[in-house]
Amino acid sequence: MSPPPTPPRRTPHFGDLTVMSLLISSLVLLVAYIAIRPRFSHGRLLVDQLHDLTAEEVSLLPEGTIPVVLGRGLGENNRGFKIQLLRLVMQRSGAPHAIGLTASALSQDAAVDALATGVVGGTDNPQAITVGAYGAGPELNRRLRAIPIPITGGMLGLRVGWTHHNRLAGLEGVHDREDLSRLTLLQGQGWSELEMFDQAGLRTFATPSQNLFRLVSEQRVDLFPQGVADVQAQEAIAQKWSKSIVMDPHLLIAYPFAGFFYVNHRNEALAAAIERGFRRAIEDGSYQELLERVVMTPWLKEQLNLSQRRLIVLPNPEGAKALEQVQSNHWIVPWETLSDGQINRGEQLCALPRFQALCP
């Protein structure tokens, strides 16, 4: 009896190979992920994939790596100037670090409270924030440790305003502080500007950050002044609320003011790294290059129309005390000249070399 015939060998089809390849690839990726997950933050540092940095990731950082978790503010993302500057500063510092934004936005009050605890993670600081970028003020300087180098060279004290287009006609007639005092201005709760506006005799309404553009869209305020370095990042948020929210083209409100990086008083390593790296970035020109590329953009130049604005300078005696440690060569805005009344029009600012990127 002859043996049974051997069945023909089945030739694998393309679809079989594809499915098998996908299964093998998926298995390899899974094994690789499990293997590298404990070193995720270290790998993040090496490949410069700097996005959000969560409390869990901070807890997994190698010993000796400084966690640099910047509090996310209104409209901020990983393309914003503050986080890009902080990346540059930390790179220049030479300190081992991992950096990112908090996973979600924090009000300034909540962020300052968390930073002041000195705890990274846990119920008192669930987003593990280690550094904030805020307008300088005596109370803030008491609660936290300031790195006294202006984040935008003092441009935070140059304010343009978001408004409803129905309010533009009224703003056109504003020429001085007395005119400005007849308006209702808007600011966020806990912001350092509130006390200064009160002392200047201005009428100001404060609200949590999530309500700011809603109040503008509902025409419950006349003007929401913001630093010229911040408005481009905020435009998308403004437009989501209402197409009727526009930038006022008439006024530039100025007062001696600056934003600093702030850390907990006991965070010596991070404070020293930020100050060292910031000074190096100023000295080698990379800070000015970043400022012109990210802040002084063609969009801002067009929307700001600086040469056509009327300048209203406000006193800020309390704020000036918080700025006493700033070295003169770290300022971009000439506050002494502005404060004594020598400059009262935007076109005069355009004559200064450091402002020419914002002017025709």
Please place each PLM-identified region on the residue numbering.
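Periplasmic-binding protein-like
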Residues: 154-160, 239-275, 297-321, 327
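Extended ligand-binding regions for polar small-molecule ligands
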Residues: 83-93, 165-168, 181, 256-300, ...
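A conserved helix-loop-strand patch within extracytoplasmic ligand-binding domains
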Residues: 145-195
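Extracytoplasmic small-molecule ligand-binding "clamshell" domains
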Residues: 52-142, 274, 354
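A ligand-binding cleft/hinge motif common to bilobed small-molecule-binding domains
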Residues: 116, 130-143, 224-244
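Short loop->beta-strand "edge-of-pocket" segments that line small-molecule binding or catalytic clefts
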Residues: 60-77, 172-190, 223
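An extracytoplasmic/periplasmic, membrane-proximal ligand-sensing/linker region
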Residues: 283-360
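Ligand-binding cleft/hinge of the Venus flytrap
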Residues: 85-99, 173-179, 188-210, 235-241
